[in-house]
């Protein structure tokens, strides 16, 4: 998956873009780690149980803070999944929305109208 100006999680009707006020230290405060290439990476389990079989939410922000990519993947991170298809994933959607709303509130991303 390539870095993009605006993106959405597979199946989500909401698109996000980078905020002009985004700062590197804000991403680090939210739990992003720096890769060897200088990009910022976020990788969290959406399932709040101790189980390692739940889907993962991943965001990678380019080092220039202009483009990014995000996805919900299988536990091993190899395949994107759509948590918006089935009603049984309501808790996962709620956890995803909570994380993204916190990032929007901290001026990392903006919702595209």
Indicate residue ranges for each PLM-predicted region.
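Terminal, regulation- and interaction-focused segments at domain boundaries
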Residues: 1-30, 112-113
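Long, solvent-exposed, polar/charged low-complexity segments
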Residues: 12, 38, 54, 104, ...
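Charged, low-complexity, helix/coiled-coil-prone segments
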Residues: 1-7, 32-49, 100-107
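C-terminal basic regulatory modules in eukaryotic proteins
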Residues: 60-113
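Ser/Thr-rich, low-complexity intrinsically disordered terminal regions
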Residues: 16-17, 21-67
């Amino acid at each position: 998956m390539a870095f993009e100006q605006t993106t959405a999680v597979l199946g989500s009707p909401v698109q996000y873009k980078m905020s002009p006020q985004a700062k590197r230290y804000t991403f680090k405060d939210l739990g992003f780690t720096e890769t060897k290439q200088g990009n910022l990476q976020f990788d969290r389990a959406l399932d709040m149980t101790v189980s390692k079989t739940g889907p993962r939410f991943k965001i990678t922000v380019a080092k220039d803070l202009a483009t990014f990519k995000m996805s919900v993947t299988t536990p091993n991170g190899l395949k994107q999944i759509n948590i918006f298809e089935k009603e049984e994933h309501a808790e996962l959607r709620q956890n995803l929305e909570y994380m993204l709303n916190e990032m929007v509130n901290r001026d990392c991303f903006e919702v595209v109208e």
